[in-house]
């Protein structure tokens, strides 16, 4: 009875962990999709520079392909683990454990690789100044994608230019910065701010923002936290799966052992009862012979007297 209660408890815990797998995997996919616009625009602005290489090394190899593949696979694995737990299927549970172990090793290797790449990122602040060369094509019809990338980055990161908003006046033929540099954006806001109040423009350059982006954004920190949480949950799930496998395997062997023991006990009891039944006639005959011998001896002694 106690073993059955333990099995129920283990199954409930595995249900909860599989639910966590689904929730965390969906969260990772959502955050990765959220980061896609950031990464696409950053790569557009940093094309053919050392900054682009740093962005690719920091984000793309692990954050997008590997994490997305692992999370999609975890959703499927969680479903099979749930089915194995419901049906108490030893084969499904063993496959579930092995798959979790392989995924955990892949995640661990990716984490180590990412840490080494972050240490090796060769970007310095001086490299950010080279981004000014990408400003000269802003607003040209054939470079609409670059114009969109600059506007998106300046709006999202609340910055203007590379070092300062005057970079737009130095590197282009514009008389004032783009409207995306305005704190409160509306058509013609940049011209109005440039003529009346410069405080209505973002004062910080985008170079520092991009450098901070390479050091790690909130989205990247969230992904790292989710990755660590998934790893810890996988360890717990593997421990519980091994325990459940042992309990189910023991339960399947235990009834046979009990049956054999009961058969042996029944056989021994039957043999003992049968032996007693067989011994009863013999004992009665011995008692009769003993009585007859005693009576004969008594009769013989009386004749001698």
Curated annotation (Swiss-Prot):
The keyword Lipoprotein applies. Belongs to the tetraspanin (TM4SF) family. Keywords: Angiogenesis, Cell membrane, Lipoprotein, Membrane, Palmitate, Transmembrane, Transmembrane helix. The gene is Tspan12. One of its GO terms (cellular component) is plasma membrane. GO terms for biological process: angiogenesis; cell surface receptor signaling pathway; maintenance of blood-brain barrier; Norrin signaling pathway; regulation of angiogenesis; retina layer formation. PANTHER family: TETRASPANIN (PTHR19282), TETRASPANIN-12 (PTHR19282:SF462). Residues 34-59, 111-224 are extracellular. Regulator of cell surface receptor signal transduction. Plays a central role in retinal vascularization by regulating norrin (NDP) signal transduction. Acts in concert with norrin (NDP) to promote FZD4 multimerization and subsequent activation of FZD4, leading to promote accumulation of beta-catenin (CTNNB1) and stimulate LEF/TCF-mediated transcriptional programs. Residues 1-12, 246-305 are cytoplasmic. It is found in: Cell membrane. It is a multi-pass membrane protein. Component of a complex, at least composed of TSPAN12, FZD4 and norrin (NDP). Interacts (when palmitoylated) with ADAM10. Interacts with MMP14/MT1-MMP. It comes from Rattus norvegicus (Rat). The keyword Transmembrane applies. Its main location: membrane. This is Tetraspanin-12. Palmitoylated; required for interaction with ADAM10. The precise position of palmitoylated residues is unclear and occurs either on Cys-9, Cys-12 and/or Cys-83. It comes from the Eukaryota. The lineage of its organism: Eukaryota, Metazoa, Chordata, Craniata, Vertebrata. The chain crosses the membrane at residues 13-33, 60-80, 90-110, 225-245. A lipid is attached at residues 9, 12, 83 (S-palmitoyl cysteine).
